Regions:
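Outer membrane pore-forming secretion/assembly proteins and partners of Gram-negative envelopes
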Residues: 1-151
Length: 151
């Protein structure tokens, strides 16, 4: 769509999609060595959605510029990653509409449409792993902002 491409070109590089692969477990004994705990803000937000889980570790993060191709990947892991396609701006121009796919070992396991706005992350539930669950956190990030919190 020509209109979509024009809008994308106008704001190319001004926004990024930031993603984190998170390991969620119910007890501290199940945590993995060598990984950082999610910061308090992220852990609190995740615990509100995934109520059975008490501990969250960040396994990897990645930020990818929006609008640079017809589709892009946010891939902190070779096995679990998110493919996203730009589907336009929200009516207020603040957020973006995305077609999201969560991929596990080369297969799409979740497909959804999402609207991302600053301060409103999206959480995607992935497969069970070890004694816990893999989660994917996505947030819209200003292109100049390299911070990772959920603000």
């Amino acid at each position: 769509d020509v209109g979509k491409k024009a809008v994308a070109n106008d704001i190319e590089g001004s926004k990024k999609l930031w993603g984190a692969l998170v390991y969620a477990v119910k007890d501290a004994a199940s945590k993995r060595d060598g990984y950082e705990d999610a910061d308090a803000e992220m852990a609190k937000a995740l615990q509100q959605v995934f109520k059975d889980y008490k501990h969250f570790q960040v396994l990897g993060t990645r930020a990818e510029a929006l609008f640079k191709t017809t589709h892009s990947w946010v891939a902190p892991s070779k096995q679990l990653c998110v493919k996203f396609d730009f589907a336009g701006l929200t009516e207020d121009g603040i957020g973006v509409k995305l077609d999201l796919q969560l991929w596990n070992q080369g297969k799409a396991i979740v497909k959804t449409d999402a609207i991302l706005k600053p301060g409103s992350p999206v959480f995607m539930e992935g497969p069970e792993w070890g004694n816990g669950l893999l989660l994917y956190v996505l947030k819209l990030q200003d292109g100049k902002d390299d911070k990772e919190p959920l603000d």
